[in-house]
Amino acid sequence: MKKTPNYLEDRLCLNVLANSVENAKACYEAAQGHVVLGVLSKNYATDEAAIEDMKRYIVATDNALSVGLGAGDPNQSAMVARLSEVLQPQHVNQVFTGVGASRALLGQNDTIINGLVSPTGTVGMVNLATGPLSSQAPAGIVPIETAIALLKDMGGSSIKFFNMKGLTHLEEYKAVATACAENDFYLEPTGGIDLENFQEIV
């Protein structure tokens, strides 16, 4: 099965949460395949239960599965890495510090892995302390260009800029988008995106 998302014009792919296999299939068909369907690891008590259920999504959507944390929960990082090793999905959501483990366990470079960084209130700077322990420590604020380079070092594919809260951090988002373009890196704006602000964000 294909391990990379099906981008529209090689540029854009939606990532939406699916609440059932049937819903995932409907979303996949509505988006003409230009979508990955998020299923949250946090919703499962065990790896085995998650793997069994997520395999159903893989079959229904031709592997357009996005293994999710659950509202960016850093405590799900290790579980996401373990699930991804078995499932080999098209897309993996990770906190910044979980990217390297996920890439190593996947054993291939096709799956897209994002690394979660947060807005700081300062244009051009992001917080990469989003892991299980680091998220409880003082912020790790670095230039967006440095965050991108670190993610590349770890085998990451994209920046997950979360939580955007819609257009609240628009100027910061523009700087992140510019840096991603200049450094040939994917960008995943996340948080508070709706039909009203979708076009402006894209």
Roles of regions detected by a PLM:
Residues 1-30, 51-53:
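N-terminal amphipathic alpha-helix/helix-capping segment at the start of soluble metabolic enzymes
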Residues 43-49, 74-76, 166-169:
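Acidic-and-aromatic substrate-binding clefts and catalytic sites of carbohydrate-active enzymes
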Residues 149-202:
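Conserved binding-pocket/active-site segment within a compact domain
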Residues 4, 59-60, 125-128, 154-157, ...:
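A short alpha-helix capping/helix-coil boundary motif
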